[in-house]
Each structure stands twice: as structure tokens, then as C-alpha cells.
Amino acid sequence: SATFSHGSFCYIPPDTHCPLELSTYFRINNKESGQFERTLIIADKNSYVSYLEGCTAPQFDNNQLHAAVVELVALENATIKYSTVQNWYAGNEKGQGGIYNFVTKRGICIGNNSKILWTQVETGSAITWKYPSCILAGHNSIGEFSSIALTNNYQQADTGSKMIHIGKNTKSRILSKGISAGYSANSYRGLVKIGPKAHYSRNYSQCDSLLLSNTSKANTFPYIQAQNPYTKIEHEASTSKIGEEQIFYFLQRGINLENAISLMISGFCKEVLNELPMEFAVEADRLLNLKLEGTVG
């Protein structure tokens, strides 16, 4: 990405706290076209930046391709927060059209006490493959990944994260929420690797899946590698459906079915939505409910 010709480049000087939420907007307008933008963000010592990314596309019967590369570099005591709300066209109810979303996202915490936070809300595209990663090279560095992946109709989403611990006393957290409706398939695929010299490092992973139909699928594929005995790794996973008792509870209180489903979806995703900036969180919550209109009931 050092030689990319288009996209975004952001450098935060030492001892600088960026006062604004930097943002970009990507859109694919043409039929059968591809978008290959590059993003490079470098946060120097003792700096902070929050970067927002939004994606949309018009409806076509043909497929388009989005294959971007995002690279984050955090130096000593620096923090980078990267948030994405992805709403590419997902195709029609029969699975025709839509964007193929194949994205490479990676970050490296080079300096000690550095931090990279990935937050993403995936609601669009016909097929999504995305695995944001953190290489925790600096001692005491932190990597976090928070994700909501919603699929409906014939969408396929294969998302997750990679946390590679190299420095000592490094910490990582993975929080994944998957919602499947229609005939869609939603998979979490993640790697947690703690190297031989990453003593006293720790990882916590939580993968929750919610099924909204009898024909949708949810999968979890965690890969865990611990190469020294002084580490702690925790992994939790759950798969559930919205039960009749829950719906009955809302109906008894005068809340109709559509609003009941909306409230339950918001509660299921609350932990991830709270990681987004306030304006983004409100819009992302509305987007999730909009994508599921008419799905249940």
C-alpha cells in the first residue's frame, strides 16, 4: 500500500489527539465494475485517531467487486479506532446481483502500549470475506475486534479476526455477533495465535449467533494456537433463536411483533453498537432493523 494510487492516507503526528472523527464514503456506481481503494493510517507516538468508513451501492442485476486493502500502524502509546458500516447492495430476494466484498484489513501495534480497535457492521453485499487482523508486536499492546454481521435472503458472510501476539503482556478481545435470516449463511472464522515469547498474554473471544429462520445457517470456526505456557485464552460461543415466550412477553405488553423483533435485535447487538460513535450507532441500529423488515412473522 506504500505505492497506492488512490484511496486514503492519514498520518497523525506525535502527541496529537485528532479532535474530529475522520470519515470516508465509498460507492460503486457502474455495472460489472470493481473498486480497489487503499487506506493507510499511521499514528505516531502518543497520538489518537478515530476513522469512520461507509459503503453503499445502487441496485443492479449484475455483480460488482470490492477488493480493498486497509493498513493501520500504531506506534508507542498510540491508539487507532477504525469503524465500518458496510451497506453494499446485497442482491434481490432471489439472490441475483449484489457486491462481492473481499477485503484485506490488517493492523500492527509496533510500539509498546499501543492500541488498535476494529469495529464493523456488515449488512450488505452478496458475499463477504473479511478478517481484520492485529499483530501485537509491542509489549503491553492491545487489539480489539467488535463485529455485527447480518445476512438475509441468499447472502453469505464469512467474517472474523486474527489476533497475533508477539510482545509480552499483550491483550486481545474478539466480540462477534451474527444474525442470519432467510436462506443465508453466516460464519465466524478467527485465529488467535500467541507466540513463544509473548509471555503473560491474554485473549478473550465471544461469538454469538442468532437464527431468525429455519433455513438459515450459522457457523463458528475458531483457530487457537498457544506457543508458551504463560498465557490465558478464553473462548465462548452460542447459537440461539428468538423464542415464542420472548415474543409473547412483548405482545402481552402491547408491543407489536415488528417492534418486538426490533428491540430484541437491538439488545443482541448492543455491546458492539456501543463501540461506534454515537451518530453512527443510531444509524447502524436503524439499518439493522430496516434490513430485517418483513423477515419474521
Curated annotation (Swiss-Prot):
<keyword id="KW-0150">Chloroplast</keyword>
<dbReference type="InterPro" id="IPR010231">
    <property type="entry name" value="SUF_FeS_clus_asmbl_SufB"/>
</dbReference>
<dbReference type="GO" id="GO:0016226">
    <property type="term" value="P:iron-sulfur cluster assembly"/>
</dbReference>
<dbReference type="InterPro" id="IPR000825">
    <property type="entry name" value="SUF_FeS_clus_asmbl_SufBD_core"/>
</dbReference>
<comment type="similarity">
    <text>Belongs to the iron-sulfur cluster assembly SufBD family.</text>
</comment>
<dbReference type="InterPro" id="IPR055346">
    <property type="entry name" value="Fe-S_cluster_assembly_SufBD"/>
</dbReference>
<dbReference type="GO" id="GO:0009507">
    <property type="term" value="C:chloroplast"/>
</dbReference>
<keyword id="KW-0934">Plastid</keyword>
<dbReference type="InterPro" id="IPR037284">
    <property type="entry name" value="SUF_FeS_clus_asmbl_SufBD_sf"/>
</dbReference>
<dbReference type="Pfam" id="PF01458">
    <property type="entry name" value="SUFBD_core"/>
</dbReference>
<protein>
    <recommendedName>
        <fullName>Iron-sulfur cluster assembly SufBD family protein ycf24</fullName>
    </recommendedName>
</protein>
